[in-house]
């Protein structure tokens, strides 16, 4: 099927440039973002090479299908393992989820970076109320972990903090 430039833009795959419309994800590894049923709703992309002043990751902008505050990466793959184990491990990044699943640890999902929301925890609470948070041990990860505690309390889930030595 052929898509119009407007349809591509509305899907969050292109951006307006000074010379017209351009590929938003050029020079990046694209990772599909899927909803809880496994349908692609957006993309995140990581730089393949370091580029000065360029963000390491970019996401599809907010669209009708993709809402960063509600999205839980990997949930469609992890939900059966979460039900069986009766807990979920919540990590920062998509690549953390991919690595965990490759190693056979399947009850792992991610937020969009450190931006944990009530909506993320409510989505996870449909499968378990035992949330095990394992954010990175850097400043951003520690700050996000501290922000997560009152959010978990408000949602009414049990939150444990896991730390991995650096």
Where are these regions (language model features)?
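Phosphate-handling DNA/RNA-contact segment within nucleic-acid enzymes
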Residues: 1-131, 144-145
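Conserved phosphate-handling catalytic cores of large alpha/beta enzymes
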Residues: 116-166
């Amino acid at each position: 099927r052929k898509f119009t430039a407007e349809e591509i833009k509305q899907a969050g795959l292109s951006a307006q440039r000074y010379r017209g419309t351009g590929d938003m994800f050029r020079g990046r590894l694209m990772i599909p973002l899927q909803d809880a049923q496994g349908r692609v709703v957006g993309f995140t992309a990581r730089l393949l090479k370091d580029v000065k002043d360029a963000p390491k990751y970019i996401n599809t902008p907010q669209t009708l299908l993709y809402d960063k505050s509600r999205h839980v990466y990997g949930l469609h793959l992890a939900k059966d393992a979460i039900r069986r184990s009766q807990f979920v491990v919540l990590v920062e990044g998509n690549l953390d989820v991919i690595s965990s699943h490759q190693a056979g640890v399947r009850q792992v999902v991610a937020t969009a970076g450190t931006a944990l929301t009530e909506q993320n925890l409510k989505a996870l609470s449909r499968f378990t109320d035992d949330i095990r948070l394992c954010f990175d041990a850097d400043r951003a990860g520690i700050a996000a972990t501290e922000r997560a505690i009152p959010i978990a309390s408000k949602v009414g889930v049990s939150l444990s903090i896991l730390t991995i030595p650096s």
